[in-house]
Design a protein with these regions (language model features):
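A short local loop/turn or secondary-structure capping micro-motif enriched for an aromatic residue
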Residues: 23-26, 59
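Short, mixed-charge low-complexity intrinsically disordered segments
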Residues: 33-65
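Short aromatic-glycine-(Arg/Gly/Cys) micro-motifs in beta-strand/loop hairpins
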Residues: 1-14
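Generic structural signal for short, flexible, solvent-exposed coil/loop and linker residues
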Residues: 6-9, 23, 48
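A short, exposed loop/beta-hairpin motif centered on an aromatic-Gly-Thr core
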Residues: 12-22
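Non-membrane alpha-helical secondary structure
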Residues: 19, 26, 53-54
Length: 65
């Protein structure tokens, strides 16, 4: 397992560290933990996995070492 930092793309601040196999699964874990409603999309952008929601929130998963 690797550790991924979930970054708020609006403020560019790290929110949490999530252990996962890849960035997509880290964002899925983050979504299940913190986002209870709304529509969302997880896609790859510039080599990083990004989660965007209908509320205008954008998060990305970056592998930490």
């Amino acid at each position: 397992m690797k550790n991924f930092a979930i970054i708020d793309m609006v403020s560019n601040k790290p929110l949490c560290i999530i252990p996962a196999v890849n960035g997509k699964s880290a964002l899925n874990k983050f979504k299940m933990r913190l986002m209870s409603s709304g529509f969302y999309e997880i896609h790859k952008e510039s080599g990083n996995w990004v989660l965007s929601s209908t509320y205008g929130a954008y998060f990305k998963a970056i592998e930490t070492y």
